[in-house]
């Protein structure tokens, strides 16, 4: 089975064409391929499928390194767009895809970057899903080591965002692991640690559900900016610096879609036995 290795700001992917070849996946196979010493090594596996909706171009599926399937990955979406173009699966500049929880438009820019319409942020707790009686801009979450104030949003996947004074000293791995599996997140969550530099610039580290801390998390950057705007901390255009590089996020507020722009790089092509 043919695949490509790609990355978006160091968030790396095994990308498989399920349009022109038969694909057989199991959690065990995905975990085997994800092993960085004995396999391909990746944060997520991305699967390109024929469209479920005749008005769209493709269906987009995402699997974490632990084999679990998730409904969104922003960095992956940019790599998805670059992949289907490189492989000649489409010649469109604007590519319509469906995911497990919605639709997206992926736009190839003249400068080589990819702009993604991520849709509207979702704030209703039941739709995130998050256990709360009503939407609030800030929630209190208690763990064994720390009580935190955070914002919660879905970008097609659940995000919990907390503000920190210094991104370098933030307790990302220990606190992230506890919050990822907090009882109020029935489907677990991605945990963002956000340092606000000014109203147009943040630094961010993300502990991703099923993957741990990654070099970059596109949907996490979107979630952090959406929360920051809702909390009155940020303006509508924000530069997000992640360990792996920079993303640019735009959101005009409630009722508007959120846009993410960034790089997507092809590393190599390979083949595995399935």
Curated annotation (Swiss-Prot):
Gene expressing this chain: dapF
UniProt entry keywords in alphabetical sequence: Amino-acid biosynthesis, Cytoplasm, Isomerase, Lysine biosynthesis
GO molecular function, one term: diaminopimelate epimerase activity
Species of origin: Glaesserella parasuis serovar 5 (strain SH0165)
Sites where the protein binds substrate: 11, 44, 64, 74-75, 157, 190, 208-209, 218-219
Name of a matching Pfam family: DAP_epimerase
Top-rank lineage group of the source organism: Bacteria
Family per similarity comment: Belongs to the diaminopimelate epimerase family.
Reactions catalysed, as given in the entry: (2S,6S)-2,6-diaminopimelate = meso-2,6-diaminopimelate
Protein's GO biological process: lysine biosynthetic process via diaminopimelate
Chief site of localization: cytoplasm
UniProt EC number: 5.1.1.7
Pathway stated in the Swiss-Prot or TrEMBL entry: Amino-acid biosynthesis; L-lysine biosynthesis via DAP pathway; DL-2,6-diaminopimelate from LL-2,6-diaminopimelate: step 1/1
Full protein name: Diaminopimelate epimerase
A GO CC annotation given for this chain: cytosol
Site (Could be important to modulate the pK values of the two catalytic cysteine residues): 159, 208
Subunit structure: Homodimer.
Functional note: Catalyzes the stereoinversion of LL-2,6-diaminopimelate (L,L-DAP) to meso-diaminopimelate (meso-DAP), a precursor of L-lysine and an essential component of the bacterial peptidoglycan.
């Amino acid at each position: 089975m043919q695949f490509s290795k790609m990355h978006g700001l160091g968030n790396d992917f095994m990308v498989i064409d399920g349009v022109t070849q038969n694909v057989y996946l199991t959690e065990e196979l995905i975990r085997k391929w994800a092993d960085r010493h004995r396999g391909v090594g990746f944060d997520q596996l991305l699967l390109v499928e024929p469209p479920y909706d005749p008005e769209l171009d493709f269906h987009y599926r995402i699997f974490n390194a632990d084999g679990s399937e998730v409904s969104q990955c922003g960095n992956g979406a940019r790599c998805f767009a670059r992949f289907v173009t490189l492989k000649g699966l489409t010649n469109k500049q604007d590519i319509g895809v469906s995911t497990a929880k919605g639709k997206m438009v992926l736009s190839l820019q003249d400068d080589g970057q990819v702009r993604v319409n991520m849709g509207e942020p979702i704030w209703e707790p039941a739709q995130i899903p998050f256990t709360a009686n009503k939407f609030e801009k800030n929630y209190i979450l208690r763990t064994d080591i720390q009580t935190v104030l955070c914002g919660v949003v879905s970008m097609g996947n659940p995000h919990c965002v907390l503000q920190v004074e210094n991104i370098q000293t933030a307790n990302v791995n220990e606190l992230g692991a506890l919050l990822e599996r907090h009882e109020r997140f029935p489907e677990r969550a991605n945990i963002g640690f956000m340092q606000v530099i000014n109203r147009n610039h943040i630094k961010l580290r993300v502990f991703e559900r099923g993957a741990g801390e990654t070099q970059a998390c596109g949907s996490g950057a979107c979630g952090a900016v959406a929360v920051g705007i809702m909390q009155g901390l940020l303006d509508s255009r924000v530069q997000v610096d992640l360990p792996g590089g920079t993303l640019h996020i735009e959101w005009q507020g409630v009722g508007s879609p959120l846009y993410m722009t960034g790089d997507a790089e092809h590393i190599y092509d390979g083949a595995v036995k399935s």
